[in-house]
């Protein structure tokens, strides 16, 4: 029994060491990516960035990532939540957005769109309709508040998924493209981070995000 207890303790110590190493790697990667973003000009001093915010881990990580950047260069950030009128628990989402913005002292905006109506009228899928209306609504708010950029929380897993999806659809090798880091006034600052890295960092800083 004593031997078994010792083995369990050793396993726990090994797990803790691995987690510490992983956390240090993520911290280094974050600092490196912040530096790259500044050098590449993806985000510049005095940029006003509107974050497409759902309350999920990706958008919460994106907020904290840009907040770190805010401490390095002078940028302004706000968050926007789009209600697609497709979920029954929207009230929980709105409550979370309000609590998040208050606890992080960040301005937030909410816009409502009727995805089903748009999909029927334009004979498009719900997914495509939601995407089109979402970007349209975010762009409208961006102009209204005088911001110059929109940031989305696409990560490395999304990028790989998009590439594979296009490959399976039979897209030619020359036509295969992953998600771009920037397109017009839209930037994707966390595109090089894996989902596991995002979750690990959020747990480290004890961040709260909305569960699906």
Model-derived features: positions:
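Long, low-complexity Q/N-rich tracts
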Residues: 1-25
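A short, basic/flexible loop-to-alpha-helix module at the beginning of a structural domain
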Residues: 23-51
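ATP-dependent adenylation/pyrophosphate-handling site
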Residues: 43-93, 109-115, 180-182
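Glycine-rich phosphate-binding loop signature in dinucleotide/nucleotide-binding domains
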Residues: 44, 140-148
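Short, surface-exposed alpha-helical segments at coil->helix boundaries
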Residues: 63, 90-98, 195-199
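Short, well-ordered alpha-helices that flank and scaffold nucleotide-derived cofactor binding pockets
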Residues: 64-71, 99, 140, 169
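ATP-dependent adenylate-handling ligase core
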Residues: 82-139, 173
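Catalytic subdomain that performs nucleotidyl-dependent activation
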Residues: 149-153, 158-212
């Amino acid at each position: 029994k004593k031997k078994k207890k010792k083995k369990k303790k050793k396993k726990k110590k090994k797990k803790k060491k691995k987690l510490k190493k992983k956390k240090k790697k993520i911290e280094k990667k974050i600092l490196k990516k912040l530096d790259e973003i500044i050098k590449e000009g993806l985000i510049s001093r005095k940029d006003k960035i509107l974050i497409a915010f759902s309350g999920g881990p990706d958008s919460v990580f994106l907020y904290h990532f840009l907040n770190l950047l805010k401490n390095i260069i002078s940028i302004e950030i706000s968050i926007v939540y789009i209600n697609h009128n497709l979920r029954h628990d929207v009230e929980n989402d709105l409550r979370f957005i309000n609590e998040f913005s208050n606890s992080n002292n960040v301005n937030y905006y909410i816009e409502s769109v009727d995805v089903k109506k748009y999909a029927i009228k334009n004979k498009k899928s719900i997914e495509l309709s939601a995407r089109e209306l979402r970007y349209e609504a975010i762009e409208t708010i961006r102009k209204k508040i005088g911001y110059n950029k929109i940031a989305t929380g696409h990560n490395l897993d999304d990028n790989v998924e998009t590439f594979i999806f296009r490959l399976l659809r039979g897209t030619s090798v020359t036509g295969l493209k992953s998600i771009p880091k920037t397109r017009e006034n839209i930037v994707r600052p966390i595109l090089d981070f894996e989902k596991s890295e995002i979750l690990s960092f959020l747990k480290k800083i004890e961040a709260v995000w909305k569960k699906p």
